[in-house]
C-alpha cells in the first residue's frame, strides 16, 4: 500500500516541500535561517493576535491599553515583550539570511531573490507600523518624521503625506489605519513566503560550494528537520533570555512617555534594525536625495545578480571577495552605530564616509574584484 503522505492531495504537497524534498548534503548552519524566519513569523502572528484582542487603536487610549496589557492581562507582559523582541530576532535572522544569499551567490535564483526583496520591504513596513502602535513619544515622532519623507516626492508629495495621515498631522486616523495595515501585512508576508518557497523548490537549494549538487542529494527529513529543530531551540532560548532578563534592552526609553505633539524628543531615531538605512538617509543634506538613497540602500539588492561578474557562484573559494564582503559587514555595523548618534561632528563625516563605502563596495568594488579573480584563475 502506498504511503498516505504521498497520495493525499494536501499531504503530498507538504511531503514534497518538507519531508521528501531532495536537499544538498553539504548545507551548513547558514541554511537554517529560512526555517528560523518561519518560526519568527509564526511567533509574531500568534503573539500579535492575542495583543490585538486587548489593544485599542485610539490616540486617547492606545498608550493606556498597552499599559493595561502589561499590568492586568494574564501574561500580557510576556506577550508584549515576546512580540517586541521577536521583531528584533526576526530582523537578525532576516539580515543573516540575506547575507548568506550574498556570500554564497544564492541571488542567481532571480525569482526567489526578487520575492525575497519584496518580503524584506513588506516586513520592514510591518515593523515600522507596529512601532507606531504603542503611541509613545518615539512612536509619534518616528511616524511623523518617516511619513514626512514622502513629501520630498515632486508635485504629489504633500498631498500623498496628508492622504497617508488622514489629516494635516499624525493623529487618530493615522493610528487606526496603521493598526489595520499592521494586522493585515503579516498575512500578505505569509502568502509571499509561500511564493518564495514555490520558486525555491523549482530550482532546489544552493549549497556552500556553489557547485550543482544534483548527484549528491539527501532527503530533508530526518537530516535537515533535526538540524532545523536545533536552530529553533537556540533561537527561542536567545529570545526567552532577552524577554525574561532584559526586555527593554533594544527598545527606546522615550517610548515609555505618552505621545505629545508639543514636545520633540532630543534624538528621534527608529528601532535598531532600521538604523543603517536611517544613517544613509541622514548622510545626504538634500531631502529628495536622502529619500532616494534610503530606498536604494535596500533596492540595490535587486541589481546584485546583474553585477555578478565572477566565474564562480559562491565566495567560498574567492578570498579577495571575502575580504570585501566582511568590509561591507563592518560598514553596515558602522552605519547602525551612526544612525543612533546625534547629528554632530564627527558622526556626520563618519556616516557620509560609510554611506559612500556601502554603495561603492556593492556597485563597483565587488564586480571589479570578481573580474580580477577571474583573471588570476588563468594563472
Curated annotation (Swiss-Prot):
Molecular function per GO: metal ion binding; ubiquinol-cytochrome-c reductase activity
Residues bound to a ubiquinone are 201
One Pfam family assigned to this protein is Cytochrom_B_C
Q: Where does heme b b566 bind?
A: 97, 196
Q: How is the cofactor bound?
A: Binds 2 heme b groups non-covalently.
Instruction: Report the membrane topology from the UniProt record.
Output: Multi-pass membrane protein
Residues that span the membrane, as ranges: 33-53, 77-98, 113-133, 178-198, 226-246, 288-308, 320-340, 347-367
Gene Ontology biological process: mitochondrial electron transport, ubiquinol to cytochrome c
- PROSITE patterns for this protein: CYTB_CTER (PS51003), CYTB_NTER (PS51002)
- Superkingdom of the source species: Eukaryota
Ordered alphabetically, the record's keywords are: Electron transport, Heme, Iron, Membrane, Metal-binding, Mitochondrion, Mitochondrion inner membrane, Respiratory chain, Transmembrane, Transmembrane helix, Transport, Ubiquinone
Q: Which InterPro entries match?
A: Cyt_b/b6_C, Cyt_b/b6_C_sf, Cyt_b/b6_N, Cytb/b6-like_sf, Cytochrome_b, Cytochrome_b_C_euk/bac, Cytochrome_b_N_euk/bac, Di-haem_cyt_TM
Q: Please tell me where heme b b562 binds in this chain.
A: 83, 182
Q: Where's it found, cell-wise?
A: Mitochondrion inner membrane
Q: What is its main location?
A: mitochondrion
A single cellular component GO annotation: mitochondrial inner membrane
Please tell me what else the database record remarks about this protein: Heme 1 (or BL or b562) is low-potential and absorbs at about 562 nm, and heme 2 (or BH or b566) is high-potential and absorbs at about 566 nm.
The role this protein plays is:
Component of the ubiquinol-cytochrome c reductase complex (complex III or cytochrome b-c1 complex) that is part of the mitochondrial respiratory chain. The b-c1 complex mediates electron transfer from ubiquinol to cytochrome c. Contributes to the generation of a proton gradient across the mitochondrial membrane that is then used for ATP synthesis.
Its quaternary organisation is: The cytochrome bc1 complex contains 11 subunits: 3 respiratory subunits (MT-CYB, CYC1 and UQCRFS1), 2 core proteins (UQCRC1 and UQCRC2) and 6 low-molecular weight proteins (UQCRH/QCR6, UQCRB/QCR7, UQCRQ/QCR8, UQCR10/QCR9, UQCR11/QCR10 and a cleavage product of UQCRFS1). This cytochrome bc1 complex then forms a dimer.
Q: Which family does it belong to?
A: Belongs to the cytochrome b family.
Which PANTHER family does the record match to this protein?
CYTOCHROME B
**Protein name per its UniProtKB record:** Cytochrome b
Gene source species: Artibeus intermedius (Intermediate fruit-eating bat)
Lineage at the top is:
Eukaryota, Metazoa, Chordata, Craniata, Vertebrata
Amino acid at each position: 500500500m502506498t504511503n498516505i503522505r504521498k497520495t493525499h492531495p494536501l499531504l503530498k504537497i507538504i511531503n514534497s516541500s518538507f519531508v521528501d524534498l531532495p536537499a544538498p548534503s553539504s548545507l551548513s548552519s547558514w541554511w537554517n535561517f529560512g526555517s528560523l524566519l518561519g518560526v519568527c513569523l509564526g511567533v509574531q502572528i500568534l503573539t500579535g493576535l492575542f495583543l490585538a484582542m486587548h489593544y485599542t487603536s485610539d490616540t486617547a487610549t492606545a498608550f493606556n491599553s498597552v499599559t493595561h496589557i502589561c499590568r492586568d492581562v494574564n501574561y500580557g507582559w510576556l506577550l508584549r515583550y515576546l512580540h517586541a523582541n521577536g521583531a528584533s530576532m526576526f530582523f537578525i535572522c532576516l539580515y543573516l539570511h540575506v547575507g548568506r544569499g550574498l556570500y554564497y551567490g544564492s541571488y542567481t535564483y532571480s525569482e526567489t531573490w526578487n520575492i525575497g526583496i519584496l518580503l524584506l520591504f513588506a516586513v520592514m513596513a510591518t515593523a515600522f507600523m507596529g512601532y507606531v502602535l504603542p503611541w509613545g513619544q518615539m512612536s509619534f515622532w518616528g511616524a511623523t518624521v518617516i511619513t514626512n519623507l514622502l513629501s520630498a516626492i515632486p508635485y504629489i508629495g504633500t498631498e500623498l503625506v496628508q492622504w497617508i495621515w488622514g489629516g494635516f498631522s499624525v493623529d487618530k486616523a493615522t493610528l487606526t489605519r496603521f493598526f489595520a495595515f499592521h494586522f493585515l501585512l503579516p498575512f500578505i508576508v505569509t502568502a509571499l513566503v509561500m511564493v518564495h518557497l514555490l520558486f525555491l523548490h523549482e530550482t532546489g537549494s544552493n549549497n556552500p560550494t556553489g557547485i550543482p549538487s544534483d548527484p549528491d542529494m539527501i532527503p530533508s527529513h530526518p537530516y535537515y528537520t533535526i538540524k532545523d529543530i536545533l536552530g529553533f531551540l537556540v533561537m527561542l532560548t536567545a529570545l526567552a533570555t532577552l524577554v525574561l532578563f532584559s526586555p527593554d534592552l533594544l527598545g527606546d526609553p522615550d517610548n515609555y512617555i505618552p505621545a505629545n505633539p508639543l514636545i520633540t524628543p532630543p534624538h528621534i531615531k527608529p528601532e535598531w534594525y532600521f538604523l543603517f538605512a536611517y544613517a544613509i538617509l541622514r548622510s545626504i543634506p538634500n531631502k529628495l536625495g536622502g529619500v532616494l538613497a534610503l530606498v536604494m540602500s535596500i533596492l540595490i539588492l535587486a541589481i546584485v545578480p546583474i553585477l555578478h561578474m565572477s566565474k564562480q557562484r559562491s565566495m567560498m573559494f574567492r578570498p579577495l571577495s571575502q575580504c570585501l564582503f566582511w568590509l561591507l559587514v563592518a560598514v553596515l555595523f558602522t552605519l547602525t552605530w551612526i544612525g543612533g548618534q546625534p547629528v554632530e561632528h564627527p558622526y556626520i563625516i563618519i556616516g557620509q564616509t560609510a554611506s559612500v563605502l556601502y554603495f561603492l563596495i556593492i556597485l563597483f568594488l565587488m564586480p571589479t574584484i570578481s573580474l580580477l579573480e577571474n583573471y588570476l584563475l588563468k594563472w
